[in-house]
A protein has these predicted regions:
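Walker A/P-loop
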Residues: 64-85
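Alpha-helix boundary/capping segments in eukaryotic regulatory proteins
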Residues: 76-82, 92-98, 103
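Contiguous, well-ordered alpha-helical segments that form the cores/surfaces of helical PPI scaffolds
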Residues: 55-58, 80-92
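Residue-level preference for the first positions of well-ordered beta-strands
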Residues: 67-69, 98-100, 151
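Conserved nucleotide-state-sensing and coupling region of NTP-binding domains
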Residues: 102-153, 158
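N-terminal accessory segments
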Residues: 1-66
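Post-Walker A helix-loop "phosphate-sensing" segment adjacent to the P-loop in P-loop NTPases
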Residues: 89-98, 121-125
Length: 159
């Protein structure tokens, strides 16, 4: 910063610089799934497999890839990515989107719905996607709506 600025001007310039950096970061999170994951999960450490999954999910989001099956060993974040963070990211990109979350049990599907719904209410999410709001009457974890007409519905296919 230029030393020709008085302290008040320096403070104002610094605040503007920080705001511009935040806007740039938010735009990156809106466009890049892995950047979004890092913004919502600061402790996350990306491995090679995470980058591959994120790229494939981005291709699903763009409509370039119509079907995707993720087969990996347990505890490799496939559920965190595909069933929790990806629906939240997609809802942020398109708040009028309708999402059906299907798992082998209703309990598991509703749990993902609860996590996703709670994320949409967090300040860190609202910084990236400020236009996304839950509908006022959305109380259930397994079936909720956005104020833009989007919907999330959790269903179990086994029980």
């Amino acid at each position: 910063m230029s030393s020709n600025l008085n302290p008040a001007q320096q403070e104002k310039a610094l605040k503007l610089e920080l705001r511009l950096a935040q806007i740039s970061k938010n735009e990156g999170c809106q466009l890049n799934f892995l950047d979004f994951v890092r913004s919502q999960w600061p402790e996350f450490i990306a491995g090679r497999h995470h980058k591959i999954i994120a790229e494939k999910l981005e291709r699903v989001a763009s409509g370039e890839l119509k079907r995707l099956i993720i087969n990996m060993a347990p505890r490799h974040t496939k559920s965190e990515f595909a069933s929790f963070l990806f629906p939240a990211w997609m809802m942020g990109k398109n708040p009028s989107m309708k999402i059906i979350q299907a798992t082998h049990t209703t309990e598991l599907a509703v749990n993902f719905g609860r996590k996703t719904k709670n994320l949409l209410d967090m300040d860190s999410y609202k910084m990236v996607f400020p236009e996304v709001k839950l509908a006022a009457d959305s109380k259930a974890s397994g079936r909720w709506d956005t104020s833009a007409g989007g919907m999330y519905y959790a269903v179990g296919v086994g029980s």
